[in-house]
A protein has these predicted regions:
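Residue-level detector of alpha-helical transmembrane segments in integral membrane proteins
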Residues: 12-16, 66, 280-281
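N-terminal, post-signal peptide beta-strand-biased segments of exported outer-membrane/organellar beta-barrel
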Residues: 26-134, 339
C-alpha cells in the first residue's frame, strides 16, 4: 500500500512539472492590457486564488484544509491527511480606459495559477506550483499637441510615438507548513522567479498624415532578462473564543534582495542604424514585504477576515532611460518606486455545510472589498530621474460562489466562480483611468488518495 501511494504521488508530481512549461507559455500570452504595465516591473499579479479572490484577496489568517492557501505557507500544516489537492484557475477581463474625453475598450485572459498540495505527516504539509508575479502588456500611441516646422519645406510636422510592451515575471515554488504544537503553525515558500520584458518606443514624424523623410527619429528598446529567487515566511495562531467560535491571527514576511539579471537599452534611428547600447547588471530589486491578518470563524458556517499588506518598494531600483540635452543614459534609480500598502476585507457564508438535501445549502457565498496604494511613480517628460507623479490607486469589489462537486467518495472538490470590479484611478487628470470587469474561474480537486479500502 505504501509503495503504491509513493508511486502515485511521484508520478503525478512528474506529470505536473512536465505540463508546466506550456502552461507558462499560455500565462505569458495574455493578461490584462494596461498602459500602467509600462512602468516598474509591470502590473503586480493578484497572488490570491479563485476562492479568496471572491473574498477581496484575504488569506493571511485563513488555514488550508480542504483547499490550498498560498498567501501564508503556515496554512499548509492544516491539510487533511487523506487528501491530495490540485487547484487551477484562470480569468478573463473586460476593460475601459479613458482620459481627456477619449476612451478605448480592451479585453484579455490568462492562466492565473496551477497548484498542488498534500500532507506529508501529521502537522506537516507540502505545496508546490506556478503563479505569475507580474504582467507587462500594452500598446498605445500618442500624438504631440504642438507641431514642428520643417526647416526644408516649411510644413507643419507632428511627432507620433508608439509604445509597446510585453513580458513579465513568473514563479514556481515549493512550500512547507509545520505545526510544532497545538493551534500554532509556521511555514515557508521557496520560489524561483524568472522572466523578462521588452519596452519599445517608436517615433514617426508626419506631414498631413504622411511620413516626413526629413526627420530621423530616435527609437528605443528596453530589454531585461531575470532569474532570481523568492523567499517568504509565515505563521498562524488560532484560539477558541467560544464553543462555536475560533479566532486566527496570521503574519508573513517576504525577503527583499537584488535580482540576478541584466537590462539593456538599445537606441537606433528610423533607418535601422544602431546608435548605442547601454547595459546595467544587477540593477533590479524586489522589496521586503510584510502582511498581517485576522479571521473569525463561526462553526463552519461564517468566516470574516481582514488583511493588511505593506511592501517597501521605495528603496528598490530599476534602470530608467534619461534624456538630458540630447544625451541618453540608462542608470538604475529608486525614484521610479514608492512604498505601497493594501487593505482587504472578505466574508464567506455557507448555510449548512453538512446538508444532505438541498444543494444550495452547501454552496459557499463570498464577498469582499480591497484597496491598494500605487507602488510606481510615473515620470513626467523624458527624464526617469526628474519630476514624477504617483501611479494609480486601485479599488476593488468582488463576489463569488463555491460550488461543491459531489460523488459517493468525495464531497470536497469545488468549482470557484467569482466576479470583480477593479478601478485604477490616478491622482491627476493627465493620466488614464481604468475600469475592469473580471471573471475568475477556479477548480479545486480534493481527492481522497490515502484512504484504505477493505476488500471483502
Amino acid at each position: 500500500m505504501n509503495q503504491f501511494k509513493a508511486t502515485r504521488i511521484s508520478s503525478l508530481i512528474a506529470y505536473l512539472f512536465m505540463t508546466l512549461c506550456p502552461l507558462v507559455a499560455i500565462a505569458q500570452s495574455g493578461g490584462t492590457s494596461s498602459s500602467y504595465s509600462r512602468f516598474g516591473l509591470g502590473l503586480l499579479n493578484d497572488q490570491a486564488q479563485g476562492w479568496n479572490r471572491a473574498m477581496g484577496g484575504v488569506g493571511v489568517a485563513l488555514p488550508s484544509g480542504s483547499k490550498l492557501n498560498t498567501l501564508n505557507p503556515a496554512s499548509y500544516a492544516h491539510m487533511d491527511s487523506l487528501s491530495f489537492i490540485l487547484d487551477a484557475g484562470m480569468s478573463g477581463n473586460f476593460g475601459h480606459m479613458s482620459m481627456d474625453g477619449n476612451s478605448v475598450n480592451v479585453n484579455g485572459g490568462s492562466l492565473d495559477y496551477v497548484l498542488a498540495g498534500f500532507r506529508l505527516r501529521k502537522g506537516l504539509g507540502l505545496s508546490f506550483g506556478f503563479k505569475p508575479y507580474s504582467t507587462i502588456n500594452y500598446n498605445y500611441t500618442t500624438v504631440d499637441k504642438e507641431a514642428y516646422r520643417d526647416v526644408v519645406t516649411g510644413e507643419l510636422v507632428r511627432n507620433t510615438t508608439n509604445y509597446q510592451g510585453s513580458g513579465g515575471l513568473n514563479q514556481v515554488f515549493v512550500g512547507l507548513g509545520w505545526k510544532p504544537f497545538s493551534n500554532f503553525s509556521i511555514g515557508a515558500n521557496v520560489g524561483l522567479l524568472w522572466g523578462g520584458y521588452d519596452h519599445v518606443m517608436m517615433q514617426n514624424f508626419t506631414t498631413d498624415g504622411e511620413s516626413n523623410s526629413h526627420f530621423d527619429a530616435f527609437n528605443f528598446i528596453q530589454h531585461a532578462d531575470v532569474l532570481t529567487y523568492k523567499l517568504d515566511f509565515g505563521a498562524q495562531y488560532a484560539f477558541r473564543v467560544s464553543p462555536r467560535d475560533w479566532l486566527t491571527i496570521g503574519a508573513t514576511v517576504g525577503l527583499g534582495h537584488k535580482f540576478d539579471g541584466e537590462t539593456f537599452l538599445y537606441r537606433f534611428m528610423t533607418t535601422g542604424d544602431t546608435l548605442s547600447v547601454d547595459g546595467e547588471k544587477d540593477g533590479l530589486d524586489i522589496p521586503m514585504s510584510y502582511a498581517g491578518g485576522i479571521a473569525w470563524q463561526h462553526k463552519n458556517v461564517l468566516v470574516l477576515s481582514a488583511d493588511a499588506h505593506y511592501q517597501a518598494w521605495g528603496g528598490c531600483r530599476i534602470p530608467a532611460m534619461v534624456i538630458d540635452k540630447g544625451n541618453v543614459t540608462y542608470p538604475s534609480t529608486d525614484r521610479m518606486y514608492k512604498d505601497n500598502y493594501s487593505l482587504h476585507l472578505g466574508a464567506e457564508y455557507t448555510p449548512d455545510p453538512l446538508a444532505t438535501k438541498g444543494y444550495f445549502k452547501r454552496v459557499k457565498y463570498r464577498v469582499g472589498v480591497s484597496y491598494s496604494s500605487p507602488y510606481m511613480n510615473i515620470p513626467q517628460g523624458t527624464g526617469g530621474l526628474g519630476s514624477s507623479t504617483e501611479g494609480p490607486r486601485e479599488f476593488g469589489v468582488s463576489l463569488g460562489l463555491g460550488l461543491p462537486i459531489s460523488n459517493r467518495y468525495n464531497n470536497r472538490s469545488m468549482v470557484n466562480f467569482g466576479m470583480q470590479w477593479l478601478r485604477r484611478a490616478p491622482g491627476t487628470q493627465s493620466l488614464i483611468t481604468e475600469n475592469y470587469f473580471i471573471l475568475n474561474l477556479g477548480v479545486t480537486f480534493n481527492e481522497r488518495w490515502f484512504m484504505k479500502f477493505k476488500i471483502q
